[in-house]
Amino acid sequence: MSGYVAGYFGLTPDDEAVPIVVVGLDHKSWHFLARYGYEDRDTFSAWAGRIFGFGDQVAVSLTPMVGFAVGNTDGIGAGLEFALDWGRLSVYNESELLIPFDGSESWFYAWGNTSYRVADWFQPGVSIQRLRVFQSEREVDRGISVGAEFGRLSATVYGYNPFNENRFWQLGVEWGF
């Protein structure tokens, strides 16, 4: 069994702090997630799915998942995690469709990052997201990322819409086990 605990701390364009907490566990070919603040503020979600991986030089994994959310937003969803690693290049995307129980409009979330490991511990990249939590004026937020790894601990700073007035920042800290 392996897993991680991650905290993401965002600062919105109106200087409001937004925390997101994620716990992930992998057991054999199964992936489990518990998240707080990801689908909406003050909302908890749980997800489970099967990991399908293939490739050696180019390693790819696909994880279709189902889940639910309770809190400010209550609903069920379907999601997909995608990861590709090729040498020093990493591409990652997580997407989900959440269908609220109250009959309000469904919501599609997506978050992705592409990075290049220039040193064993350092990886700059680009990121894109569509999250309800940040409520920015843009439908899709584009940005840059700068990450560092020190053993099992990693930290990444994301800057979304860095060249306009809707910019916001996010710090992600993750501990793997």
Language-model regions, residue ranges each:
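Beta-strand-dominated lipid-handling architectures at cellular/organellar boundaries
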Residues: 1
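Outer-membrane beta-barrel transmembrane domain signature
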Residues: 4-18, 22-29, 38-43, 51-55, ...
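N-terminal carbohydrate-binding/catalytic regions of secreted carbohydrate-active enzymes
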Residues: 33-34
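Amphipathic alpha-helical scaffolding segments comprising HEAT/armadillo-like alpha-solenoid repeats
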Residues: 59-61
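A short, structured active-site edge motif that brings together acidic residues
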Residues: 63-68
